[in-house]
């Protein structure tokens, strides 16, 4: 990531990638990919029958009965969101903050993007009253809001929106005639799935919600791009599905055949892969809790992470200490922490937050070690936080944040 100076750049800003697992590829998945390496024929646009059928089963296990005629696959969720945005037309609404890859695709199409505030307790889903106010303001100014993108388990905040908030926001969006894209990329990474209620907007508003899931979250390695979309099961959904396929065809956006073979297998969730996925989530939950403790113990603010492989920290309380290091905004903070921590630390401006706010996303994957052997050991260890390489990485984080806390205390005026 580089400083986003205006000179030499267009209006589109590309943000950091999804937080990776930091773990080696499961041998079972690698075997399916290699077995399909000699397939010369291109996959169908929208996905092969095997991928589509597996996607239907994936959603049905999550309570969403799905018609194969309303499913599409693409090489990553960004391609699907680009096609959906182009097919639906109009202006786009997103929460603030939001995933770094949402807004650039609307801007690439020349579509205005409007950020809507989220409640203090969670990210990913806009406050319903702020949503209504934004929609009415945009329309009063001559805009045409048509699409709301939201997420239940959120990047960058790592939080899960409560069902009552989701209900109110979905009702508000429905009342304004918005189509919803529910990014459910992180739904399978909940730290406490038994204690966290997660409902899809598609269960509440079947005719106006398209679900998008990037398989890089829990099912495939980040370097094997594949994603699936579930369209509304009615005439409008069928028409939208057809338009999206047209756009994917124009883009040549097909899933590579070996990746498609691995995706079709992963979507069936065989026991070995399901167990590996559960162990991965448990590992990142433990590391995220330790990372959160290090951050808040130094005086920064961060919601306790509930999903994903990341947390979102507000270093506003340490602004005075950071100013002593030349840090005045989120870009400065990104560069400072990336250098000090030795791992990417994208600033909040990458996620649509105010540049002046000292916010940053911190990922857990880079804390798992520097080699495949070290990272694999994290999965099998009964005490991964005590492994030397993990302990060193967390100690570095604690040291950096503790130094900032100490600097802030030295700068406090006498009482």
Where are the regions that the model predicts?
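Short, flexible/disordered intra-domain loops and linkers
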Residues: 121-126, 159-160, 190-196, 239, ...
């Amino acid at each position: 990531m580089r400083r986003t100076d205006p000179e030499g750049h267009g209006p589109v800003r590309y943000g950091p990638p999804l937080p990776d697992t930091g773990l080696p590829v499961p041998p079972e998945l690698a075997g399916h990919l290699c077995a399909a390496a000699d397939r010369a024929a291109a996959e169908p646009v929208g996905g092969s029958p095997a991928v589509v059928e597996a996607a239907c089963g994936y959603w049905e296990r999550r309570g969403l009965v799905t018609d194969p005629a309303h499913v599409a696959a693409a090489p990553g969720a960004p391609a699907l969101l680009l096609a959906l945005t182009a097919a639906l037309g109009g202006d786009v609404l997103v929460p603030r903050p939001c995933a770094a890859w949402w807004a650039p695709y609307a801007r690439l199409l020349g579509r205005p993007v409007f950020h809507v505030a989220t409640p203090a307790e969670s990210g990913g889903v806009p406050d319903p009253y702020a949503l209504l106010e934004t929609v009415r303001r945009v329309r009063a100014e001559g805009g045409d809001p048509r699409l709301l993108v939201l997420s239940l388990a959120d990047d960058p905040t790592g939080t899960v929106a409560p069902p009552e908030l989701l209900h109110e926001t979905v009702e508000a969006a429905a009342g304004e005639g918005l189509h919803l894209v529910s990014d459910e990329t992180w739904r399978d990474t909940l730290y406490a799935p038994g204690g966290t209620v997660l409902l899809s907007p598609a269960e509440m508003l079947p005719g106006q919600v398209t679900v998008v899931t990037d398989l890089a979250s829990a099912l495939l390695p980040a370097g094997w791009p594949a994603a699936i979309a579930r369209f509304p099961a009615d005439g409008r959904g069928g028409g939208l599905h057809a338009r999206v396929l047209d756009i994917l065809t124009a883009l040549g956006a097909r899933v590579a055949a070996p990746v498609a073979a691995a995706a079709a297998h992963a979507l069936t969730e065989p026991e070995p892969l399901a167990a590996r996925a559960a162990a991965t989530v448990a590992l990142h939950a433990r590391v995220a809790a330790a990372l959160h403790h290090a951050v808040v113990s130094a005086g920064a603010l961060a919601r306790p992470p509930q999903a994903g492989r990341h947390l979102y920290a507000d270093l506003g309380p340490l602004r005075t200490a950071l100013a002593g290091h030349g840090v005045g905004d989120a870009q400065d903070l990104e560069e400072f922490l990336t250098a000090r921590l030795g791992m990417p630390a994208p600033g909040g401006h990458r996620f649509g937050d105010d540049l002046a706010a000292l916010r940053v996303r911190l990922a857990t994957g880079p804390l798992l070690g520097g080699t495949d052997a070290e990272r694999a050991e994290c999965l099998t260890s009964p005490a991964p936080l005590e492994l030397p390489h993990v302990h060193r990485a967390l100690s570095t984080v604690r040291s950096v944040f503790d130094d900032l806390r100490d600097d802030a205390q030295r700068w406090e005026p006498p009482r």
